[in-house]
Amino acid sequence: MSALILDGKSVTKKSEEDLRSRVARLKELSNGAVPILATILVGNDPSSATYVKMKSNACTRVGMDSLKVEMSEETTTEELLAEIAKLNANPNIHGILLQHPVPPQINERQCFDSIDLSKDVDGVTCWGFGRMAMNETSYGSATPKGIIRILEAYDIQLEGKHAVVVGRSPILGKPMAMMLLNKNCTVTICHSKTVGLDKIIKTADIVVGAVGKPEFIKADWIKDDAVVIDAGYHEGGIGDIELQPLMSRVKAYTPVPGGVGPMTINTLIYQTVEACELKLAQ
């Protein structure tokens, strides 16, 4: 049996074609204005700078603009809050991304929660998470929302399925579980300290690896015909799941790289365009 490859690059390419049309339409309706994503980079972390550049490039590909705000390593919580307040008040900014991580002297949660809900296109505020958990309108955290979009693009059945999410981070594991629950999955949330993890995963129709440890989830823990989503990425191009032995016996899987990663950035852009459309409709 050959497993279905859930190709995030392919889904992203199709999404970008649609987003280009939507941005062009917004430009017509707003006298040349286009959606703008503001990214805030605090400090000198090279990986963060790379991610911000990738997001800027994604904006360009669909005809959007991006505004990069760079702040020093010595930035205080108060200074960052003031910058976010300016972006909240700017009517030309439709989405705000605070690149994680920030320097240790900054209260990251306080800064995340200061982002206006209508501009929280990365789905990082507690208020947004609460609305999402209650199945109310909100912007989902970009990675789990991207995973849902991949599953829907390939018509993977979710309703009635048992999904095991391995990981409990506030921007991935927890929102992933809530989104799957909202799609009528029966959801079990596990983590690296779960007792009997292998036995629990063996019961899963859908496995989401979001634990942040390379190949932590072993291939023989996963049953035949499962759908395998690997949200991890580590040095050497491996994820959180031991994928290689699974490729011939599971129903479908996301490759690493090229699966979840492209959809995370695309979802950020997708939700920024959506925010602009909603504002224009008001």
Curated annotation (Swiss-Prot):
Record keywords, A-Z: Amino-acid biosynthesis, Histidine biosynthesis, Hydrolase, Methionine biosynthesis, Multifunctional enzyme, NADP, One-carbon metabolism, Oxidoreductase, Purine biosynthesis
Keyword set includes rRNA processing: no
GO molecular function terms noted in the UniProt entry: methenyltetrahydrofolate cyclohydrolase activity; methylenetetrahydrofolate dehydrogenase (NADP+) activity
GO CC terms, sorted: cytosol
Keyword Nucleotide-binding applies: no
Pathway(s) this gene product operates in, as recorded in its UniProt entry: One-carbon metabolism; tetrahydrofolate interconversion
EC number assigned by the record: 1.5.1.5, 3.5.4.9
Alphabetical list of PROSITE patterns matching this protein: THF_DHG_CYH_2 (PS00767)
Catalyzed chemical reaction(s): (6R)-5,10-methylene-5,6,7,8-tetrahydrofolate + NADP(+) = (6R)-5,10-methenyltetrahydrofolate + NADPH; (6R)-5,10-methenyltetrahydrofolate + H2O = (6R)-10-formyltetrahydrofolate + H(+)
Entry binding sites for NADP(+): 167-169, 192
Assembly and binders: Homodimer.
Family according to the record: Belongs to the tetrahydrofolate dehydrogenase/cyclohydrolase family.
Identification of the protein by name: Bifunctional protein FolD 1
Organism from which the protein derives: Colwellia psychrerythraea (strain 34H / ATCC BAA-681) (Vibrio psychroerythus)
Recorded name of the encoding gene: folD1
